Amino acid sequence: MKKMHPIEALIEQGEHQQLDFKFEVSDSKKIARTLSAFANTDGGRLLIGVKDNGNISGVRSEEEYYMIEAASKMYTRPEVPFEATRWEVNGKTVLEVYIARFICYSL
């Protein structure tokens, strides 16, 4: 039996209060609201490169990471700290963004 990748195990849980799937990052202000929402509650994870139905599409460029970084720096006060990890799953890259509980607000 093939062992499940940790990201596949997260995806299998489906989206919930602490887990959100994003096909892509196209709007820094919108992502800032998501970062802020996670930070102001119990924290959470964003999986970038995963469609709402759980299918892995993969991230298309380094730009995804930089848009998240820009969202935190430009649109949240104080800046929301996050950790990002790139995972290779079946030849596609998924960007996992972990946001810990942290009181802030989005602009």
Regions found by a protein language model. Give the residues of each.
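Conserved N-terminal catalytic/coupling substructures associated with nucleotide/phosphate chemistry
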Residues: M1-L107
